[in-house]
Curated annotation (Swiss-Prot):
Disulfide bonds join 88-161. Disruption phenotype: RNAi-mediated knockdown results in a mild defecation defect. This is G-protein coupled receptor aex-2. The lineage of its organism: Eukaryota, Metazoa, Ecdysozoa, Nematoda, Chromadorea. The keyword Ribosomal protein does not apply.
């Protein structure tokens, strides 16, 4: 990200002396992102039964990662140069881990849907809450350990957390990870779309429900692809082209522009979750009094409902995520 631009062993933000507009951009994105991510997280933890809907654990992980980014990075970026030096290493560990975790969980979400499409009768035998909790622990723990290892090579060179040095060959793993995860998610989504589109045994009504069920996945994957991948690719290429890219004003402007888009993308992620997933949307409408008392009771009271006692073979497809 902006705070981790490590090229030719030197990390330097795009703009060290932020203007009023840039400060307002970071703070406003941080506040809006915090509010919406906290709202999604509250709804998920309060009203969703993860025994019945284990895939929501993945959504919760993505939301937590984005929430931490909004709080730890966006709201503090204008004052990063004033941080105590002992905060620099934990700061980079947190923001790197959160970004990687968000990308990796998008891959898990695609894998989950691929299993659902390929093995619908055995989905709940393959995917369950316990397994996803183990995957969650392994994902966060593995990425945290990897970034702890990365920051051991980090050196503060300019007296603030804005000026740090890291061997580009060591840090190369990070941008490659982002690009590979995003392309993997996009490829899996394309595969899922092709499989769903070519299902011949489904009636039109069933097919429509299936695609509504997949809408959140496709929206999240495409949004990440267009808001995150351009910056990651430009950054990865800049490591190899070195001084040529650093002195090219057009390249720097494009990189700066796509970085801003990445920040906006993180802020909008929870909005996409609310917009595309029925349970979040209905609960939010209920909170603002726009839903009648007797509407969609089953969806709004998910937490009070037992997990289905029917075997997975007889569990129908649902389109409420």
């Amino acid at each position: 990200m902006n705070s981790t631009d490590i090229i030719a062993n030197v990390t330097k933000p795009f703009v060290e002396n932020l203007t009023l507009g840039e400060t307002a951009f970071y703070i406003s994105c941080g506040i809006v992102g915090t509010v919406f991510n906290a709202l999604v997280l509250w709804i998920a933890l309060t009203y969703i039964n993860t025994e019945d809907k284990p895939r929501q654990i993945i959504v919760i992980n993505m939301t937590v990662a984005d929430l931490l980014m909004c709080i730890v990075y966006m709201k503090t970026r204008p004052w990063l140069s004033h941080f105590n030096l002992w905060l620099c290493h934990p700061y980079y560990v947190i923001i790197w881990t959160c970004q990687m975790c968000s990308c990796l969980n998008l891959v898990w979400l695609n894998v989950d849907k691929l299993i659902y499409i390929q093995f619908p009768l055995h989905y709940y035998q393959i995917v369950n809450r316990k397994r996803l909790l183990w995957i969650t622990a392994a994902t966060w723990g593995g990425l945290y350990a990897m970034n702890i290892a990365l920051v051991t090579f980090l050196k503060i060179t300019r007296g603030s957390c804005l000026g740090v040095s890291l061997n580009p060959y060591v840090y190369l793993l990070s941008p490659i990870f982002y690009v590979v995860m995003i392309l993997t998610s996009f490829s899996l989504s394309a595969l899922i779309y092709c499989i769903a589109h070519n299902l011949t045994h489904m009636e039109e009504r069933q097919r429509s429900k299936l695609f509504r069920r997949l809408f959140f996945l496709f929206s999240s994957t495409l949004w990440t692809f267009f808001t995150c991948l351009p910056y990651r690719l430009l950054y990865l290429f800049s490591i190899f082209c070195g001084e040529t890219c650093q002195i090219n004003n057009y390249y720097k402007t494009a990189t700066n522009l796509f970085f801003r888009l990445l920040i906006v993308g993180i802020m909008i992620n929870p909005v996409i979750t609310i917009w595309t997933q029925r349970i979040y949307r209905l609960r939010l409408m209920r909170m603002f009094g726009r839903l009648r008392e007797n509407s969609s009771t089953e969806v709004l009271m998910v937490s009070n409902r037992r997990a289905s006692e029917r075997p997975p073979e007889h569990t129908p497809l649902r389109c409420d995520m």
